[in-house]
Design a protein with these regions (language model features):
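Extended ligand-binding regions for polar small-molecule ligands
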Residues: 26, 63-75, 140, 154-155, ...
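Extracytoplasmic small-molecule ligand-binding "clamshell" domains
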Residues: 26-106
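Alpha-to-beta junction loops
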Residues: 39, 78-79, 96-105, 146-148, ...
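Bilobed "Venus flytrap"/periplasmic-binding protein-like clamshell domains
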Residues: 44-47, 58-75, 107, 127-180, ...
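Short helix-initiation/N-cap motifs at beta->coil->alpha
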Residues: 66, 82-93, 137, 171-185, ...
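Acidic, polar ligand-binding/catalytic clefts
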Residues: 70, 74, 79-143, 209
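A ligand-binding cleft/hinge motif common to bilobed small-molecule-binding domains
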Residues: 89, 106-114, 160-163, 184-216
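Periplasmic-binding protein-like
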Residues: 123-132, 195, 199-240, 258-265
Length: 265
């Protein structure tokens, strides 16, 4: 076979390879960003941490999921669009409606039946904060008839608190801000949430106390709707790379979490 023929075959093979790669990229975009934008579901609250995002004064959003979503969209080569919800339970309920393409939220067995999870990027200890002046000092004195405990509705922490407390009825509320005000006004005895968020809350409400014990470890991970295999493969690789190349560390640092380690297990 002549050199020219070999060159032609090599060129043809390269062309087919490029076309295949291009088709694969388009297939991925069609699955993970069917509207032409990467729709990132975020939970809005002043709680902070690795899951919650905030509405900015300019009308935009800030937070770890906001930064990760923007970087993920850039890697895909599509614009980003944020879809805001009051809590992680609302994000979960919207998973089957095609309302979002990717999210970052606490993972538990119930949610694993409703969406597909990729790598964990945060592990948090869940506990309780008690109101100012409360005699409650530990889980034993908390778990008593008549004690009022609140949690954000339909969240992994609420399900964990309900399983943990045997004598207390845990009441769910739609937003962190609503429960914050109830605790501040002394209308509830305790609030179940992750320790880092409760530690920050205790500085805003003098006299409150975060209990030392932990009733649940909550893991936060990237997730996509069920039956999106290309999307899951893409976000899995993205998050593994983001953990190793400093992308997540940068997102933490940019959002007031410079002292928080990246915990993956």
């Amino acid at each position: 076979m002549s050199y020219r023929s070999l060159s032609s075959l090599a060129g043809l093979a390269l062309g087919v390879s490029v076309m295949t790669m291009s088709a694969s990229a388009e297939d991925l975009k069609g699955e993970i960003a069917p509207t032409g934008k990467l729709r990132v579901a975020i939970g809005i609250s002043a709680a902070g941490g690795a899951f919650w995002s905030n509405k900015t004064a300019s009308g935009g959003y800030s937070g770890v999921p906001v930064d990760l979503g923007k970087d993920m969209a850039a890697a895909l080569g599509v614009p980003v669009e944020y879809v805001a919800y009051l809590n992680s339970g609302q994000i979960t309920d919207a998973a089957s409606r095609g309302a979002w393409d990717v999210t970052f939220l606490p993972q538990d067995p119930e949610r694993e039946t409703r969406m597909s999870f990729g790598p964990i990027y945060e592990v948090a200890d869940a506990t309780y904060i008690v109101k100012a002046g409360s005699p409650i000092k530990d889980f034993a004195t908390l778990d008593q008839d008549g004690v009022k405990v609140a949690a954000v509705n339909n969240t992994t922490t609420m399900r964990g608190a309900k399983a943990h407390l045997k004598h207390v009825r845990v009441t769910g509320y739609q937003t962190y801000d609503e429960i914050f005000n109830l605790l501040k006004n002394g209308e509830i005895d305790a609030f179940a949430l992750s320790r880092d968020q409760l530690n920050a809350m205790s500085k805003k409400i003098p006299g409150t106390k975060v209990l030392d014990e932990t009733f649940k470890k909550t893991v936060t991970a990237v997730a996509v709707p069920l039956n999106h295999p290309q999307s899951l493969a893409f976000v899995t690789k993205f998050m593994k790379d983001a953990i190793s190349n400093g992308t997540i560390r940068k997102a933490y640092d940019n959002n007031g979490l410079k002292d928080s380690p990246i915990r993956t297990q």
